[in-house]
Amino acid sequence: MNIYDLDLKGLTAQLTELGQPAFRARQIYAHLYKKLANDFAAMTDLPAALREQLTANLQIGSLELVREQTTDDGLTRKVLWRCPGDAVIETVLMIYPPDRATICVSTQAGCAMGCVFCATGKLGLLRNISSGEIMEQVLYFERYLRNEGAAIAKRHGGPVPDHITNLVFMGMGEPFANYERWWAAVERLNDKQGFNLGARNMTVSTVGLVKGIRQLADEALQVNLAVSLHAPNDQLRSELMPVNDRFDISDLMDAIRYYTDKTHRRVSFEYVLLDDKNDTPELAAQLASLVKGMLCHVNLIPWNPIPGTPLTRSHRERVTAFQRVVQAAGISCTVRVERGVEIAAACGQLAAIPSPTSPINLY
């Protein structure tokens, strides 16, 4: 059993079965999430007999590291993992000096949603991943920053964080299609006895599964919500995102209003810009009309290239023009800063395939 799949209560129960007192669970929990131990032998304040029991009955992690890639500036790093059963997932760390380090975490191997502009969607769903496999992605990069932060800072020529400050569930997969396991990881990440990352430092992105949006609104933890919108009308959104045939824009907006009314928290609308597809001033005006009056922010994303598609990204001038129309309606609207395009680590590029061997021509 992967020990990362156990919360403190579950770990306590497991140790009780091994004839151990409950306080040992708290000790082990601190080793895993505070000291970042990845070997029972390193837990030297535990009796040797207990360490032997742990080694015989539990394992620390189940992911196999296959490949690591880092951008030339050293500030974006992507890891490819092999899960038990041979499915693969990817995780990305993005460092924003001097004080922010964001990890982009996968919640499924592949994705069933089939968005036409996304590399992960072309894989189909391979399998859900466990809460422990989600945790393991985070702990790997927390350990990496703790051990390598000083070297990264020296290379960068200025301070960088030595720990993860923000987490986005925007990697491979649809988090709300794996809600139970995903939420178990969220609770463990937030647990003060565990990883102790504030809920407001976590953001989950969904294609628009309305049940999940409503369920998130009812949760006690205030995790931020981002919604992949990408079109302001049903005809175009269904063309880009098959999920719109199940939950149309009207259903989606009702769920989002429920979320904002219940939580009083702002929702981010993600809008990938595709040349001559969804980037016209007319569509910008439709988008502004759709979201006006909502507690929201619009995040425009110039599309990042993926193999095997005729799509192209919007030119800079069209991105700027689109943004101005939305802003003119009084709506907060920014353009996402690109990170990791050269190692296929940017938004929409995660597909667990080799990264480009030659530079990508963006325009």
Swiss-Prot record:
Which miscellaneous remark does the UniProt record hold? Reaction proceeds by a ping-pong mechanism involving intermediate methylation of a conserved cysteine residue.
Cell compartments where the protein resides:
Cytoplasm
Keyword tags: 4Fe-4S, Cytoplasm, Disulfide bond, Iron, Iron-sulfur, Metal-binding, Methyltransferase, rRNA processing, S-adenosyl-L-methionine, Transferase, tRNA processing
Q: What residue stretches are annotated with the Radical SAM core domain?
A: 97-342
- Molecular function terms from GO: 4 iron, 4 sulfur cluster binding; metal ion binding; rRNA (adenine(2503)-C2-)-methyltransferase activity; rRNA binding; tRNA (adenine(37)-C2)-methyltransferase activity; tRNA binding
Could you tell me the EC number(s) of this protein?
2.1.1.192
Q: Which reaction equation describes what this protein catalyses?
A: adenosine(2503) in 23S rRNA + 2 reduced [2Fe-2S]-[ferredoxin] + 2 S-adenosyl-L-methionine = 2-methyladenosine(2503) in 23S rRNA + 5'-deoxyadenosine + L-methionine + 2 oxidized [2Fe-2S]-[ferredoxin] + S-adenosyl-L-homocysteine; adenosine(37) in tRNA + 2 reduced [2Fe-2S]-[ferredoxin] + 2 S-adenosyl-L-methionine = 2-methyladenosine(37) in tRNA + 5'-deoxyadenosine + L-methionine + 2 oxidized [2Fe-2S]-[ferredoxin] + S-adenosyl-L-homocysteine
One GO CC annotation:
cytoplasm
Cofactors that this protein relies on = [4Fe-4S] cluster
> What role is this protein assigned?
Specifically methylates position 2 of adenine 2503 in 23S rRNA and position 2 of adenine 37 in tRNAs.
According to the record, how does the cofactor bind?
A: Binds 1 [4Fe-4S] cluster. The cluster is coordinated with 3 cysteines and an exchangeable S-adenosyl-L-methionine.
- Which cysteines link up through disulfide bonds? C104-C347
Q: Which sites bind [4Fe-4S] cluster?
A: C111, C115, C118
CDD domains listed in its UniProt record: Radical_SAM
> Which organism is this protein's natural source?
Herpetosiphon aurantiacus (strain ATCC 23779 / DSM 785 / 114-95)
In terms of InterPro entries, this protein maps to:
Aldolase_TIM, Methyltransferase_A, RlmN_N, RNA_MTrfase_RlmN, rRNA_lsu_MTrfase_RlmN/Cfr, rSAM
Supply the name of the protein: Probable dual-specificity RNA methyltransferase RlmN
